Amino acid sequence: MAKKRKPNFLVVLIDDLRFDELGICGHPFMKTPHIDRIGHEGAMFTQAFHTTPLCSPNRASILTGQYASRHGIIDNVARDAHSHRLPNYHVILRRLGYETAHIGKWHMGNSGGPRPGYDKWVSFPGHGSIIDPILNIDGDERKYTGYITDLLNGHAVDFLKKKRDKPFALFFAHKAVHPDAFQAADGTIDFTDGGYRPAPRHADLYKGAHFPRRPNAL
C-alpha cells in the first residue's frame, strides 16, 4: 500500500485589511484581483470573526488555536519572552517531519529574531518599515533596499520553489496594509513619521478616488 502523503500548509495573513475592502466583498473601487481569485476558486467564510481583533493577540490565536485569555497575549505590549513559549502549531509540525517557515510580520514582542519551531525565519522588528526595511533572516539582521511587500514575496517564493523530500508549512504574514508606525514597549504608537506608502508602480492606482474617513479612524 502506498504511503499516504502529508499535506502542505500555506497561511497568508494580511495586516489591517477589513473584509469589506476587497473587490470580492463588494467594495466599489478597491482592486484586489489576486485575493478575489482565491475567493472565487476556494471558499469564503462570510460569518467569520475574531474574538480579539488586535495585532498581537490575533496572531497568537491563529498560531495556537487558543483564546487570548488562555495564551496570555492580550494586547500589543512587547512580550518577546512570552512569544518564545507559545504552543505554536509549527513546533508540532516540525516534530512530525515538516519543514517550517515564518516569513513576514511576527509582532508578538518588538524583536525580529527567530522564534522556536521554524527552519526558515524572515521577519523584522515591531511593525517594520515599508521602504528599505530591516530584515532578520535566520538571525542575521540588516537593512535591505526595496519595498517590503516585494522583498517578503521574494523570500516566500524561494521557499515554496525549494526542492524538498518532506512536506512544508509556511506562515506568510505581510506587513501590508499596515502603515509605518513606531510602537513603544508599552504598546503606545507614534504615527509622526508614519503613514502608508504604496509601491511606486501603484502610486496612481487610485488617482482621483475619494477615500472617506471613517468615524473611528485615528
Residue ranges of model-derived segments:
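The substrate-binding groove and active-site-proximal loops of carbohydrate-active enzymes
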Residues: I73-D80, D140-I148
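Active-site segment of extracytoplasmic enzymes that catalyze sulfate/phosphate-ester chemistry
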Residues: V11-V12, F19-H102, G112, P116, ...
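Amphipathic alpha-helical segments in well-structured domains
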Residues: K31-T32, L86, R115-Y118, T149, ...
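Alpha-helical elements of Rossmann-like donor-binding domains used by nucleotide-donor carbohydrate transfer enzymes
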Residues: N88, L151, H155-D158, F171
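Active-site-proximal cap/lid insertion segments
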Residues: K3-P7, D16-F29, P125-Y144, L160-K166, ...
